[in-house]
Design a protein with these regions (language model features):
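C-terminal catalytic-base region of ester-bond hydrolases, centering on the histidine
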Residues: 199-201, 238-320
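Conserved alpha/beta-hydrolase
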Residues: 96-115
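Short N-terminal helix/helix-N-cap motif within the alpha/beta-hydrolase-1
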Residues: 85-87, 113, 188
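Second-shell loop/turn segments in exported
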Residues: 80-83, 117-124, 218-219, 282-288
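Flexible, membrane-associating and regulatory peripheral segments of lipid-active enzymes
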Residues: 2-98, 313-320
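Serine-dependent carboxylesterase/thioesterase catalytic core
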Residues: 79, 103, 126-233
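Extracytoplasmic/secreted proteins, especially bacterial periplasmic and envelope-associated proteins
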Residues: 73, 87, 91, 98, ...
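Composition-driven, intrinsically disordered low-complexity tracts enriched in small residues
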Residues: 31-56, 65, 142, 190-214, ...
């Protein structure tokens, strides 16, 4: 074959291969970064737990994930009372992964019992759960080589996260803390605190506290009103001065009562009530962790330099 014809063939072949290879690479990259389905429903994670007990949600717990320059901190999800790694975060794990975050979720505070009881987290004392979170964060930092993580927590998970931050060395490991329905000052204080004070005046304070703590949920008593745990954790202020907090709360919270205990002012703290500017949002304690409106506020708290529109439409209670 003449050399000039061979050169023409090589050029033609190269011209054909470049777009073909580019197409293959594009398809491969698209598959690697394919969007995970996001079902805005607080209970959307439960089917994953039923199908794969103790597993991970789509987009979560990829230990080979490396944070990008746009999102340098991995996000750790900290569930609420009775929740778990999958059951609490059916919305947030795939949503964050789609946004390009490395996202991780654990089940803390569960009893060492067979499934499905092993999937019910947030039962043990908060101090024990915080130690589990501390170990998990260390694992995330080691795997991703990140300097810090961001936390998104729901309900009791906020106290677990804050105890880690303030008492277990987490201040140097957490950058942003997004707190959904956080019982910072204890819950049901107006109801429980007068009864607790009366019992203490009668010398029955320990018996009163023991009665509150008699349920399988040891953490539940720690979150009530001015319980010893709450008073001790907040003795030096609610927040850690090195961490940026965003509180997201609903006026219809039936478990964090009054809802204003989730909105404590602070120097590096932003307080958001989801009904402000959107009267159609009827989410309550569970639904707020399933709604797209609250999720948009959370995304903007993680990345305030690239804010996304926050939707406003009818959001039902319970599911969000």
């Amino acid at each position: 074959m003449p050399s000039h014809i061979a050169r023409l063939l090589r050029r033609a072949l190269g011209a054909a291969l470049v777009p073909a290879i580019s197409s293959i690479l594009w398809v491969t990259a698209a598959a690697a970064h394919a969007d995970y389905p996001v079902d805005y429903n607080f209970f959307s994670g439960i089917p994953y737990e039923l199908r794969n007990p103790g597993g991970s949600l789509p987009g979560a717990d990829d230990w080979s994930c490396r944070p990008s320059d746009a999102h340098p901190e991995p996000v750790v999800l900290v569930h609420g009372t009775g929740g778990g790694a999958q059951t609490n975060w059916g919305v947030y794990a795939p949503l964050l992964a789609n946004e390009g975050y490395c996202v991780y979720s654990l089940t803390y505070g569960a009893y060492d019992l067979p499934w499905p009881l092993s999937a019910i987290g947030g039962m043990r004392p908060i101090e024990d759960s915080s130690a589990q979170l501390a170990a998990f964060v260390d694992r995330v930092l080691a795997a991703t080589s990140a300097a810090k993580v961001d936390l998104i927590a729901h309900s009791q998970g906020n106290l677990v996260g804050n105890y880690f931050v303030k008492r277990l060395g987490g201040s140097d490991k957490v950058d942003k803390f997004v707190a959904i329905a956080a019982p910072w000052l204890g819950t049901f204080g107006p109801v429980i605190d007068p009864a607790r004070d009366f019992a203490r005046r009668l010398g029955a304070g320990p018996a009163f506290d023991a009665t509150l703590g008699a349920s399988p949920c040891a953490a539940c008593a720690q979150m009530t009103g001015s319980a010893d745990f709450i008073r001790s954790l907040n003795a030096d202020g609610v927040y850690d001065p090195e961490v940026t907090y965003t509180n997201i709360e609903t006026r219809y919270d039936e478990l964090v009562v009054p809802y204003t205990v989730a909105l404590v002012p602070g120097p590096k703290t932003t307080n958001i009530v989801v009904q402000d500017g959107c009267a159609a949002d009827y989410s309550e304690h569970a639904g707020i962790a399933g709604s797209d409106r609250a999720a948009a506020f959370a995304l903007n708290a993680l990345d305030p330099d690239d804010p996304q529109p926050v939707p406003c439409h009818f959001i039902p209670p319970i599911t969000g």
